[in-house]
Structure formats: structure tokens, C-alpha cells
């Protein structure tokens, strides 16, 4: 027997389907939303709809933005000769929090994982190679230190080496299997500063 009515159950189920939200958190959020003033609920719903309709990938680095180019790629003060390659937008945000990286990014939206059927053509490697046609001096590979992240890093390194562009990998300090989005800013900064040539 269901404890709650259909609308409450539906809201809980939809919230629980989000990553990182378990059934208890979904229940807590659902009750919070139900108890919010109607205007706030409408504003929340509108902001979700607006984000879904207007947010897209930056035409240059493929992070999420609501413009053709994201604020980082549009910023002329950034070092456009250095590209940091990350697996997802959350990893980009983690490095931006350090406030020390002055280059630009390239978001792959995944990592090579033969076990999951994800190959090089399933992530944004072709677009990365197209970006290297411009004036690029260094590519910093900042994929996660998981098996998939390491596989992706080695694949990218082999692709770029023949171009003569310097390819580096963030240093250890990031635990094996660790996701960058959960690493503190100091550790990320040390990993960036201690990067090694591949």
C-alpha cells in the first residue's frame, strides 16, 4: 500500500531518479517543495524549463552555457594556447574553483570505456583535434584517475604527440579512482602545478 497520494509519489519518484538523490532525500525534497509558496514552486519549475530549453554546449569547449561561447572561451584574458581536457563540466567547475588556472578547457563528455561500449568516437575527441589546428602550445589532460580516465589520457596523448604540441598529465595527489569534482581545491592545484609530460 502506498503511503502517499499519487501526486506526492510521482514527485518523490521523479526526484529520486536524479543522480545522487536517494529515496529519503527525494522524500525530504518533495515535502519541502510542497510546503513552498506557490510562486516559488512556479519559479523553480520555470527555471528548470528555461535551463532545458536554453542551455547548450559551448561551440568551442563543449561546456554548458546559454550563449554560443561560454564565458571562459569568450574571455580574451584567458590563455587560449593552453587547453585542459576534462571528462565533464563538473570537473571544469572544480578546476575553476582553484582560481589559479588561466587557460581554457575542452569537455569530453565521457571517457573511453570498452566495458561500457564507449569508444573514442563517442566522446569529443574529434572536436579536440580540430581545436589543435589553431595556436595551441600545451594540452593538459585532467581526466579522472580511474581506469577509464587513464585509458582516455593515454589515447589522447598518442593522438596529439605527432603534432608536436606539448601533452601533460595532472600529477598524482588525486587518488586512483577519485572523481575530480570531489577533490579539494588545494589538491587540484597541486596536481595541476605538478603535471608531467606524457
Predicted regions and their residues:
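Solvent-exposed alpha-helical segments within well-ordered globular domains of core cellular machineries
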Residues: 9-13, 27-31, 42, 46, ...
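Conserved, well-folded catalytic cores of nucleic-acid-processing
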Residues: 14, 18, 36, 51-54, ...
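Long C-terminal interaction/binding lobes of large macromolecular proteins
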Residues: 102, 129-198
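Cys/His-rich Zn2+-binding cysteine-cluster or related metal-binding knuckle/ribbon modules and their
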Residues: 2-8, 17, 27-92
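Residue-level signal for pocket-adjacent positions within structured domains
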Residues: 28, 43, 56, 68, ...
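Alpha-helix N-cap/helix-start motif
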Residues: 41, 117-118, 149
